[in-house]
């Protein structure tokens, strides 16, 4: 059975049902946000941080194209588009010092310590690495948020932005599925948001099993998993059902 929104019949909105795993989910697109996580050169482009740190980014191009498709469909349906950029100030004060676990676990920070010539080039605000990939350009009405840690809810205004608009459903795309996407969706789950991941609009950091494990965790414990074609079909005008 489709899992409905807790307020599915309260606003007379246009509802749509998205086929997903482990079951379909029903939501109002105009009370839903599409979240694009960290589609920066750092994560999706050769020569960016992930590539320099030894992660494979050779298969990110189809993900970029799928995100373009999902963003277009979401914008047409009246969904809010939120873009995240992960990183810190040029001096990396926001990254935390040795007293922060981020200092010790961030592969970007470790890569720069191991290769001093990269200092100031990885995930620094204003750098090429920090910029969104050329193919993905926010439009007027979209929201672009910086974030200093893996979760988009930590030390950002995301929660208040969503609650002020009555948004309870979040559709996730981006990189990396097993790090920032999953971290943000998990935090959203704890804050009572319904999270859906479009699996072919995401990409893992690490081996393919990391993608599979993240999607298993999400569909089993924290949310729902679908794909871009199914999402676009659900948002087409013929899929809407008027809630009286």
From Swiss-Prot:
Pfam families assigned to the protein according to its UniProt record, in alphabetical order: Isochorismatase
A molecular-function term among this protein's GO annotations: hydrolase activity, acting on carbon-nitrogen (but not peptide) bonds, in linear amides
Induction: Up-regulated by the nitrogen regulatory protein C (NtrC also called GlnG) and repressed by RutR.
Keywords: Hydrolase
Reactions the enzyme catalyzes: (Z)-3-ureidoacrylate + H2O + H(+) = (Z)-3-aminoacrylate + NH4(+) + CO2; (Z)-3-ureidoacrylate + H2O = (Z)-3-aminoacrylate + carbamate + H(+); (Z)-2-methylureidoacrylate + H2O + H(+) = (Z)-2-methylaminoacrylate + NH4(+) + CO2
UniProt family annotation: Belongs to the isochorismatase family. RutB subfamily.
Role, per record: Hydrolyzes ureidoacrylate to form aminoacrylate and carbamate. The carbamate hydrolyzes spontaneously, thereby releasing one of the nitrogen atoms of the pyrimidine ring as ammonia and one of its carbon atoms as CO2.
Protein's name in the database: Ureidoacrylate amidohydrolase RutB
């Amino acid at each position: 059975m489709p899992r409905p929104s807790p307020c599915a019949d309260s606003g007379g909105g246009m509802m749509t049902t998205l086929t997903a795993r482990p079951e379909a989910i029903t939501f109002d697109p105009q009370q839903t946000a599409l979240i694009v996580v960290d589609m920066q050169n750092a994560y999706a482009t050769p020569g960016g941080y992930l590539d320099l740190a030894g992660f494979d980014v050779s298969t990110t191009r189809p993900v970029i194209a799928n995100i373009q498709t999902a963003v277009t469909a979401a914008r047409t349906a009246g969904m809010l588009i939120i873009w995240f950029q992960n990183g810190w100030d040029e001096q990396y004060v926001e990254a935390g010092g040795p007293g922060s676990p981020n200092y010790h676990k961030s592969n970007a920070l470790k890569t720069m310590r191991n290769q001093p010539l990269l200092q100031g080039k990885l995930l620094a605000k204003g750098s090429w690495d920090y910029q969104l990939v050329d193919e993905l350009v926010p439009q007027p009405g979209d929201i672009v948020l910086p974030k200093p840690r893996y979760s988009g809810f930590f030390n950002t205004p995301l929660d208040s932005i969503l609650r002020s608009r009555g948004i309870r459903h979040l559709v996730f795309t981006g990189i990396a599925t097993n790090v920032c996407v999953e971290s943000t969706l998990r935090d959203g789950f704890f804050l009572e948001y319904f999270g859906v991941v479009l699996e072919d609009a995401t990409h893992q950091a690490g081996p393919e099993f990391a993608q599979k494990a993240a999607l298993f965790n999400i569909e089993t414990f924290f949310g729902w998993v679908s794909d871009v074609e199914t999402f676009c079909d659900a948002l087409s005008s013929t899929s809407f059902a008027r809630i009286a």
